[in-house]
């Protein structure tokens, strides 16, 4: 059974510059850490949650280790400067999945996300493998059953695989099937896709599902496509698979990208999403601290989370 645990206070430590000025603060001084999972107490805040699970990566024959990412990313976030928007972050702990119950873990995350959103919070989830996306996305769909939900994925992979069980490569096919079951439209856009890393069968599935696909080669000029997608939906779920970044910026993932989309381009793509007023949920997935020897990759991932919280409107 998937268990919930509050985040350790030892994770939120950093340099104290408060002697300089009242606003010389860092995230470890402004993030609120909750000892209970009680989203009803935190309306209008951002629920920071960890999904400590990499069973989907293992099933997908990837490099395990992403289950340790949530706490590694908290440590990287802790010492970053606190600016506008960061005071809204409330750490609502980790959902820890026992191997091999991926399906139970996804259901627990789904229920937690739905509860947060219904309570008036927004969710920022630290994965975990990309199996995080099914639990997170399903929770968003549940919370906004009467509205159109757009799923924006920055990823080298389409993750529309067809297998006999859930993996880190199946979340968007699962979400498409959930939309089918609920008789609602499946709005999915994937930016940063590597044609070299996706079979013709996956491209055919994306075409059949009317997925908006922007290849890694074209992301430097994709703001218009992003704007069009934002305009056509009511609510947005943003998921960032860190393997969208080039291997020299993000080596610490299950499947590093030989080409990838540089961090600055990723930030420019997500800025209008964050500022749209439609973003309800976001996550960072596939970070693997086992392959981050000096902590540099954790800081790259943390900068994305920092920026999302800062821009979120």
UniProtKB/Swiss-Prot annotation:
Biological process terms in GO annotation: L-histidine catabolic process to glutamate and formamide; L-histidine catabolic process to glutamate and formate; putrescine biosynthetic process from arginine, via agmatine
Cofactor: Mn(2+)
Reaction(s) catalysed by this chain's protein: N-formimidoyl-L-glutamate + H2O = formamide + L-glutamate
PROSITE patterns the record matches: ARGINASE_2 (PS51409)
Residues reported to bind Mn(2+) 1: 130, 155, 159, 241
Entries under InterPro entries matching the protein: HutG, Ureohydrolase, Ureohydrolase_dom_sf
Cofactor note: Binds 2 manganese ions per subunit.
UniProt entry keywords in alphabetical sequence: Histidine metabolism, Hydrolase, Manganese, Metal-binding
List of residues binding Mn(2+) 2: 155, 157, 241, 243
Pathway terms, separated by semicolons: Amino-acid degradation; L-histidine degradation into L-glutamate; L-glutamate from N-formimidoyl-L-glutamate (hydrolase route): step 1/1
Enzyme Commission numbers on file: 3.5.3.8
Sample GO molecular function, one term: manganese ion binding
Membership in a protein family: Belongs to the arginase family.
Role, per record: Catalyzes the conversion of N-formimidoyl-L-glutamate to L-glutamate and formamide.
Designated name of the protein: Formimidoylglutamase
Species, as recorded: Salmonella typhimurium (strain LT2 / SGSC1412 / ATCC 700720)
Gene name per UniProt: hutG
């Amino acid at each position: 059974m998937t268990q919930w645990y509050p985040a350790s206070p030892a994770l939120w430590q950093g340099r104290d510059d408060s002697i300089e000025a009242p606003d010389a603060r860092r995230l470890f001084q402004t993030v609120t850490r909750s000892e209970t999972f009680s989203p009803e107490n935190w309306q209008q805040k951002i629920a920071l949650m960890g999904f400590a699970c990499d069973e989907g990566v293992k099933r997908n024959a990837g490099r395990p280790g992403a289950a340790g990412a949530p706490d590694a990313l908290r440590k990287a976030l802790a010492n970053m400067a606190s600016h506008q928007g960061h005071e809204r972050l409330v750490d609502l702990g980790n959902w820890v999945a026992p191997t091999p119950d991926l399906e139970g873990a996804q259901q627990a995350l789904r229920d937690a996300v739905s509860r947060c959103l219904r309570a008036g919070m927004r969710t920022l989830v630290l994965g975990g493998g990309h199996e995080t996306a099914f639990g997170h996305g399903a929770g968003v769909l549940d919370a906004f059953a009467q509205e159109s939900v757009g799923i924006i994925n920055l990823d080298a992979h389409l993750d529309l695989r067809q297998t006999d069980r859930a993996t880190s490569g199946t979340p968007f096919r699962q979400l498409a099937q959930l939309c089918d079951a609920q008789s609602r439209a499946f709005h999915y856009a994937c930016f940063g896709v590597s044609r070299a890393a996706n079979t013709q069968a996956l491209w055919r599935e994306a075409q059949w599902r009317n997925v908006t696909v922007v290849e890694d080669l074209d992301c430097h000029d994709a703001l218009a496509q992003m704007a069009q997608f934002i305009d056509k939906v009511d609510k947005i779920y943003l998921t960032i698979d860190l393997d969208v970044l080039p291997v020299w910026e993000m080596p610490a993932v299950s499947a590093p990208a030989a080409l990838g989309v540089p961090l600055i381009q990723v930030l420019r793509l997500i800025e209008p999403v964050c500022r749209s007023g439609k973003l309800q949920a976001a996550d960072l997935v596939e970070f693997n601290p086992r392959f981050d020897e000096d902590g540099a990759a954790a800081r790259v991932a943390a900068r994305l989370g920092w920026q999302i919280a800062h821009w979120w409107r």
